């Protein structure tokens, strides 16, 4: 069986490892900028300068990276889309 693809974890980990600055929008309209230092199933640790914010994921509306993020090559994307279509048809 193929390995499960966890988009959220891969996206957050890519941002963390590559130290890409992000803008985080919360559901209450508040926005903040910083670098993702860590994350788990429920929270994201955002660091900006000397300040850290532990943000609960359920409070996050949108995360916008400062640069483009490619999580997998185009060839894999096409294969995954085909697999998803096959699974939906079953």
UniProtKB/Swiss-Prot annotation:
GO cellular component terms attached to this protein's record: cytosol
InterPro entries (UniProt xref): Hfq, LSM_dom_sf, Sm
Keywords recorded for this protein, A-Z: RNA-binding, Stress response
Coiled-coil residues: none
Domain Sm: 9-69
CDD domains assigned: Hfq
Gene Ontology biological-process annotations: regulation of DNA-templated transcription; regulation of RNA stability; regulation of translation, ncRNA-mediated
PROSITE patterns: SM
Recorded GO MF terms: RNA binding
Source domain of life: Bacteria
Primary role: RNA chaperone that binds small regulatory RNA (sRNAs) and mRNAs to facilitate mRNA translational regulation in response to envelope stress, environmental stress and changes in metabolite concentrations. Also binds with high specificity to tRNAs.
Family indicated by similarity: Belongs to the Hfq family.
Subunit annotation: Homohexamer.
Name under which the protein is recorded: RNA-binding protein Hfq
Annotated source species: Thermotoga petrophila (strain ATCC BAA-488 / DSM 13995 / JCM 10881 / RKU-1)
């Amino acid at each position: 069986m193929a390995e499960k693809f966890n988009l959220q974890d891969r996206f957050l980990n890519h941002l963390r490892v590559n130290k890409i600055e992000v803008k985080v929008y919360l559901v209450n309209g508040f926005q903040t900028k910083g670098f993702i230092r860590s994350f788990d199933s429920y929270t994201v640790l955002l660091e900006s300068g000397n300040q850290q914010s532990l943000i609960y994921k359920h409070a996050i509306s949108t995360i916008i990276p400062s640069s483009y993020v490619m999580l997998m090559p185009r060839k894999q994307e096409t294969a995954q889309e085909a697999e998803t279509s096959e699974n939906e048809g079953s």
